[in-house]
Amino acid sequence: MNSILDRNVRSSETTLIKPESEFDNWLSDENDGASHINVNKDSSSVLSASSSTWFEPLENIISSASSSSIGSPIEDQFISSNNEESALFPTDQFFSNPSSYSHSPEVSSSIKREEDDNALSLADFEPASLQLMPNMINTDNNDDSTPLKNEIELNDSFIKTNLDAKETKKRAPRKRLTPFQKQAHNKIEKRYRININTKIARLQQIIPWVASEQTAFEVGDSVKKQDEDGAETAATTPLPSAAATSTKLNKSMILEKAVDYILYLQNNERLYEMEVQRLKSEIDTLKQDQK
């Protein structure tokens, strides 16, 4: 029994303890298998990267390429160039992955800093005319329509002030005249009215069929004297009942009679011209008969 146990122990020790040459061979076989597996992984990763769609994020491509332990020099150069570009341009990851727009504090802070820098640069290059009018300067770079709105508001306010000034001028209370000024104003108006009335009364005296009639308005002293002289002559000569009971003439009636008289004179002038032409033709015929 003891001999059997000794044999089993020896056989197990022989199986566990291997020679050094066999151990080296086994280690080389393991390394070859691992390298073969890594090469297969690299080839599969390259194929998957080449077959990926155009919108695949750049992070996945870089991570798949960097996960391989053994690769070709071209792949290493490609990976290093991608790493350099990602270091120089960190916003590529931002644009490649739209879901990271709201979860990237670094990018948002950089954008805010750029906007602040742009605002400062625009403020430095503003002309003096805009600096004198702060209401027309746009503080928000995104809203381009506010300067136009401010300009329109300024124009509207200017127009409103002008209209208000005109209304106040029109609505200004009229100055009240003193009693002396009122009396002088009334005298001037009366004199102006009497001058017009006297001219119309003289026109009435020219018209033969209304010259002897009385007027219904006030006239000057010169016309009154002539009316008195005409009244004395009319008293000596009796007038018919129709003329005695006739109403006084107003200004419109006198002007109407004046127009009728002018037309009457024009017609008479044409008739006289025709008569003159007829007489001239008769004289010419008589001279020819005498010859």
From Swiss-Prot:
Changing residue 185 to A: Leads to unstable binding between TYE7 and DNA. SUPFAM superfamilies: HLH, helix-loop-helix DNA-binding domain. Keywords: Activator, DNA-binding, Nucleus, Phosphoprotein, Transcription, Transcription regulation. Pfam families: HLH. CDD domains: bHLHzip_SREBP_like. Homodimer. Efficient DNA binding requires dimerization with another bHLH protein. This is Transcription factor TYE7. It comes from Saccharomyces cerevisiae (strain ATCC 204508 / S288c).
